[in-house]
């Protein structure tokens, strides 16, 4: 089974709408990266129902660590930075999207994180 993981910063205290928007950016960009780099995985994930899991980190440092680990392990991923139009300053790192990819592979990086 395939899934996509979206990681959001809990320390920023973003409103619900802002959280959803940042997570949506991460989901879409990460999917597009997967579709470009590994189209068979993207297609399989679409056919399986697009499973997603949303997790949280408590700092920018933690977010960067997860992003670094995903890159090192060769996952299609993205780091989202806010445009600064509403609640938080421009350039603030808010979210990471990873995959889709095999669930068991993603667990090695994200298994220690808690659900949002």
From Swiss-Prot:
Any idea of its EC number? 3.1.1.29
Gene Ontology terms for molecular function: peptidyl-tRNA hydrolase activity
Is NADP there in the keyword field? no
Bilayer-crossing residues are none
Q: Name one GO biological process term.
A: translation
Q: What reactions does this protein catalyze?
A: an N-acyl-L-alpha-aminoacyl-tRNA + H2O = an N-acyl-L-amino acid + a tRNA + H(+)
Enzyme class name = hydrolase
Spell out the subcellular localization from the entry: Cytoplasm
Asked if the record carries the keyword Cytoplasm, the reply is: yes
Q: Name one GO cellular component term.
A: cytosol
Q: Which InterPro entries match?
A: Pep_tRNA_hydro_II_dom_sf, Pept_tRNA_hydro_arch, PTH2
Superkingdom of this entry's organism?
Archaea
- Entries under SUPFAM superfamilies matching the protein: Peptidyl-tRNA hydrolase II (SSF102462)
**Mainly localized where?**
cytoplasm
Q: Which UniProt keywords apply?
A: Cytoplasm, Hydrolase
Pfam entry (one): PTH2
Query: What role does it play?
Result: The natural substrate for this enzyme may be peptidyl-tRNAs which drop off the ribosome during protein synthesis.
UniProt cross-references to HAMAP family, sorted A to Z: Pept_tRNA_hydro_arch
Q: Which PANTHER family match?
A: PEPTIDYL-TRNA HYDROLASE 2, PEPTIDYL-TRNA HYDROLASE 2, MITOCHONDRIAL
Q: Which family does it belong to?
A: Belongs to the PTH2 family.
Q: What is this protein called?
A: Peptidyl-tRNA hydrolase
Species of the source: Methanococcus aeolicus (strain ATCC BAA-1280 / DSM 17508 / OCM 812 / Nankai-3)
């Amino acid at each position: 089974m395939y899934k996509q993981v979206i990681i959001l910063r809990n320390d920023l205290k973003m409103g619900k709408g802002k959280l959803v928007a940042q997570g949506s950016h991460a989901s879409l960009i990460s999917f597009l990266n997967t579709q470009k780099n590994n189209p068979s995985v993207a297609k399989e994930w679409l056919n399986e129902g697009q499973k997603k899991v949303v997790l949280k980190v408590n700092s920018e440092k933690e977010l960067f660590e997860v992003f670094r680990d995903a890159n090192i392990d060769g996952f299609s991923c993205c780091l989202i930075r806010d445009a600064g139009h509403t609640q938080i300053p421009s350039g603030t790192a808010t979210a990471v999207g990873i995959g889709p990819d095999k669930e068991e592979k993603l667990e090695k990086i994200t298994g220690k994180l808690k659900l949002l």
